[in-house]
């Protein structure tokens, strides 16, 4: 037997031992524990606003922390800052590259960021003295497309990329301060924990990983999906997270139990998931699908509680406001819808 084959067998045995240890700790299922709880009932949401202005597919959106303004990125080469109450466009920012895949709003409301097939994370200052929006920093360094970005504050941002890495950047110096390596496929999505000390990533190696922002180490790895993970989102208390995959399932993983708690799927759903987000309490999990719908799941019981139907093409992105009062969905039909 070759040395490589021997090592492979040892690794397989170790993995089985870890899985057995996890199973030994798993003395009950989430469905059993929540069996006495009331169901959330039928969730019906209506479209309250439709944001029209993009001329091509919308690829990404992100709410500002005021729960009123949001940023969206489209294949039309524009980044638009919207007032969701009035549907007015506060800013329409022309991008140097129209192949944008992600956008983010800084917690302060002073900056937005975007990136995509240009491999660069571009930071835009919304609060310039002249009143015009301009690029304040460009962060080159990834060797693959930029799939997701999220601000820690006005001076730091975390990015994920098709080069299989994530990175923490010092925006002022435009330097990567930490690189997070460990995935063996394109990293598609990231989600910051509520305390901003860790983040979780989902990738095309069908695994999700928990990273410590301070030292760059991978703290935990989670498997279970059988296809690319397109979206991840932290549970509001920071102790769990959800994933959405091309295998047509969403899954809930618990950090303390170190394993999957629940799978969200339906026989009628055979298409991939593009985006996931929790309600403010965490009781509902919203997921955007390739079949033009957004499904609402009862997080604790695993039942489908509702459907947001209205888009005429793939739902590519969604987000819940910080105050929990509204959901925004963005679609390849070029429209954003605000629901509650």
From Swiss-Prot:
Phosphohistidine is found on: 266
Keyword line: Acetylation, Charcot-Marie-Tooth disease, Disease variant, Neurodegeneration, Neuropathy, Phosphoprotein, Repeat, Transducer, WD repeat
A single BP term in Gene Ontology: G protein-coupled receptor signaling pathway
Source superkingdom = Eukaryota
What SMART domains does this protein map onto?
WD40
Chain positions found as Phosphoserine: 2
Q: Which InterPro entries match?
A: G-protein_beta_WD-40_rep, Gprotein_B, Guanine_nucleotide-bd_bsu, WD40/YVTN_repeat-like_dom_sf, WD40_repeat_CS, WD40_repeat_dom_sf, WD40_rpt
Tissue expression as described in the entry: Strongly expressed in lung and placenta, whereas it is weakly expressed in brain and heart. Abundantly expressed in the axons and Schwann cells of peripheral nerves.
UniProt repeat feature WD, residue ranges: 53-92, 95-134, 141-179, 182-221, 224-263, 268-307, 310-339
Function of this protein?
Guanine nucleotide-binding proteins (G proteins) are involved as a modulator or transducer in various transmembrane signaling systems. The beta and gamma chains are required for the GTPase activity, for replacement of GDP by GTP, and for G protein-effector interaction.
Record note on quaternary structure? G proteins are composed of 3 units, alpha, beta and gamma.
Q: What is this protein called?
A: Guanine nucleotide-binding protein subunit beta-4
The gene that this protein is the product of is GNB4
